[in-house]
Swiss-Prot record:
Disulfide bonding pattern of the chain: none
Record's function text: Flagellin is the subunit protein which polymerizes to form the filaments of bacterial flagella.
MF terms (GO), sorted A to Z: structural molecule activity
Subcellular location: Secreted; Bacterial flagellum
Gene3D superfamilies: f41 fragment of flagellin, N-terminal domain
Main location: secreted
Family: Belongs to the bacterial flagellin family.
InterPro entries, alphabetized: Flagellin, Flagellin_C, Flagellin_N
Keyword Transmembrane: no
Listed name of the protein: Flagellin C
A cellular-component GO term for this protein: bacterial-type flagellum
Residues in the signal sequence: none
Length: 321
């Protein structure tokens, strides 16, 4: 039936054109933003998951930065410890040289004193971001230090942050308040280091940082120093080198662990990025193909609407005739 009030063909063509325009707008939005799920209205479930994953990735990025800072910090302490071991090896060599008959022990002692100053300087200079694990100028012990290691989200949605902990008692070289807390300021019993100890303590310390250990002798020599005393000093220095080596090995292990964790966090961030992309990213090849198809459909829809409107025009001509 032909009516002057209603044009069903035009109405159908108009509805089709509206649907095409809506799809075209959606496709153009995906191409311009790069996302097929940009807001919760697009897909509430995917948007919620992606938003949580992005939040976790931002936290992991902070953890990654903290690990990098921690690695640089431990590298600083390790480098200083390595320098200290080299200087201690020089001190041991000087003491061995002093054991030779006829040498001027006073001159050698001046060299040893300079090397001890280098030890003090190396320990004090091993500071990074306001922390120093080798030198303690405070009254309290440095205690345990923590480095952020990872960010974890459990199955129930709860969040935890784990840390790498290090007891600085293993690395403090100089303690100005309590010499017993520093490897180079504490007293070491030379008698206990002998293969056949006598049971009589002969305590020595290397550096006097302001509070020397009671009942101990500083490692320094002069022409009156006996061969037995030199032997004790060499044994003590050798023991300190062994302790320093163990401490450096521990720092090296911490560095290795941090680097492994840093690599893991970086890989985890990449995996999360890929996961988010699979949920919300638009397939640009698919969307560009759809865009061309919708543009063609839009043109056809406009033509269909134009054709549908010719019915009303034909009725108008009948009345005009």
């Amino acid at each position: 039936m032909t009516s002057i009030m209603t044009n069903p063909a035009a109405m159908a063509a108009l509805q089709t054109l509206r649907a095409i325009n809506h799809n075209l707008e959606t496709t153009q939005g995906r191409i311009s933003s790069g996302y097929r799920v940009e807001t919760a209205a697009d897909n509430a479930a995917y948007w919620s998951i992606a938003t949580t994953m992005r939040s976790d990735n931002a936290a992991l990025s902070t953890v990654h930065d903290a690990l990098g800072l921690g690695a640089a910090k431990v590298d600083t302490f390790y480098s200083a410890m390595d320098t200290v071991i080299d200087v201690m090896t020089e001190i041991k060599a000087k003491l061995v040289a002093a054991s030779e008959p006829g040498v001027d022990k006073d001159k050698i002692n001046k060299e040893v004193a300079e090397l001890k100053s280098q030890l003090n300087s190396a320990a004090q200079s091993a500071s990074f971001s306001g922390e120093n694990w080798l030198y303690n100028g405070a009254s309290a012990a440095l205690g345990t230090k923590s480095i952020v290691a990872s960010f974890n989200r459990s199955a129930d949605g709860s969040v935890t942050v784990s840390t790498l902990n290090y007891d600085t008692a293993k690395s403090v070289l100089i303690d100005v308040t309590d010499p017993a807390r520093g490897m180079l300021t504490k007293a070491v019993n030379a008698d206990a280091l002998q293969s056949t100890p006598t049971g009589t303590a002969r305590n020595y310390y290397l550096i006097d940082a302001g509070a020397a250990p009671a009942g101990a002798t500083e490692i320094e020599i002069d022409n009156a120093t006996t061969g037995a005393q030199l032997g004790d000093m060499i044994s003590v220095v050798d023991e300190l080198i062994s302790q320093l080596t163990d401490s450096a090995a521990t720092l090296g292990a911490i560095t290795s662990r941090i680097e492994m964790q840093e690599s893991f966090v970086a890989n985890l961030m990449d995996v999360i990025d890929k996961g988010v992309g699979r949920l919300v990213d638009a397939d640009m090849n698919e969307e560009s193909t759809r865009l061309k198809a919708l543009q063609t459909q839009q043109q056809l829809g406009i033509q269909s609407l134009s054709i549908a409107n010719t019915t009303s025009e034909n009725i108008l001509r009948l009345f005009q005739e």
